């Protein structure tokens, strides 16, 4: 066996925060990775495949504004060889009819439109604060006034998340 994934898309578990901001499922996944390493040996690549909204960090809904890079201890563990991201991020915000914010593009399936939303669009340049905002297409820009690190808040900014990992 050349590779083994110890789990996938456990967002509901990996984001449970315990005492002292420890994430118990992440601790358990590190332990599991070490056990799998013993069983499968050094030649087998081991990883975890995070949900696209889980890989970069955890943003608690406690008004603190504090992000937690809760999976970093797993990603940096000696028993982990690869980071998997189950990547099905939004590629468009297309609406039926001619009256919507993306209507200036020729069509939902236009390659340039779709490309522009890989490192752009929802989850990169802007987000919706609520279901009502989504329905009305009230887009809130993603910024970071405190540290000029907007990538922290952009779920689609894999390039800068990875660059900051160093």
Task: Give each language-model segment a name.
Residues 1-2, 8-166:
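Noncatalytic carbohydrate-binding groove/subsite architecture in carbohydrate-active enzymes
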């Amino acid at each position: 066996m050349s590779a083994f994934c110890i789990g996938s898309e456990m967002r509901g578990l990996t984001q449970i925060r315990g005492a002292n901001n420890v994430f118990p499922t992440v601790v358990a996944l590190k332990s599991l990775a070490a056990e799998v390493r013993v069983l499968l040996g050094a030649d087998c690549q081991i990883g975890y495949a995070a949900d696209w909204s889980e890989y970069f960090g955890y943003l608690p809904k406690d008004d603190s504004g504090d992000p937690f890079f809760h999976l970093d201890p797993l990603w940096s563990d000696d028993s982990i060889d690869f980071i998997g991201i189950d990547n099905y991020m939004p590629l468009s915000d297309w609406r039926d009819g001619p009256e919507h914010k993306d209507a200036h593009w020729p069509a939902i399936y236009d390659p340039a439109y779709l490309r522009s939303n890989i490192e752009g669009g929802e989850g990169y340049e802007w987000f919706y604060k609520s279901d009502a905002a989504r329905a009305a297409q009230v887009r809130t820009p993603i910024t970071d006034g405190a540290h000029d690190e907007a990538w922290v808040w952009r779920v689609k900014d894999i390039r800068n998340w990875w660059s900051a990992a160093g």
